[in-house]
Amino acid sequence: MQSYQVQDVKDFMKKLLLTDTFDTFLLSEASVTTYAAFHLDGSMHSDYFSSDEAESLTVEQCGYVLWKRVRPIFFELMKGKNTPLSFQIVFRLAPHNVESLIRQSGLSHRPEDIDGLFLNLRYDGSNLTCISGSSLRVFTMDRSLDHAWDTMLEKFFHKKEIIVSTH
């Protein structure tokens, strides 16, 4: 687990809400406090969609919606002349990307033993922190998956020109 302090909150928010920077992440949950508190559960309810629409939900069939699907809703909740009092977003890496990370990093973990790789975003009204996390279905003292996930996130931040400092 690694904590990253975002150096340019305004630029980060633009990338989060107005671009596709985070669109491939799955949304586990999100909450924002503005004039009221709003909570979004990222659980996918595929029975809501017609059979034709459901066929196009391949990535989301793992049970969570893609950020790109709820980003406009989250933007609507946050836009206005006042900054949100706070927000928290919990992203999770899509299962096919978890498998790619394992393969590319040469790890011995089995994908079915990994419940999720997470990126938690926390804004407190002035500071924005990103915290990596993992959840395994098995006990292990091996932290190689955490290190690989942190390395992947650091490369992601660099590629997307998101300036962070580590704690």
Language model: regions and residue ranges:
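A generic structural micro-environment signature
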Residues: Q7, S28, T33, S46, ...
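Surface-exposed, low-hydrophobicity interaction/linker segments
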Residues: Q61-N127
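Charge-rich, low-complexity N-terminal segments
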Residues: M1-W67
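Context-gated lysine
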Residues: K10, K14-K15, K68, K79-K81, ...
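General N-terminal targeting signals
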Residues: H39, M44, F49-D52, Q104-R110, ...
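Mixed-charge, glycine-accented linear interaction segment located at domain edges/termini
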Residues: L128-H167
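Short, surface-exposed, charged/polar-biased interaction segments
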Residues: F22, A30-T34, S43, R110, ...
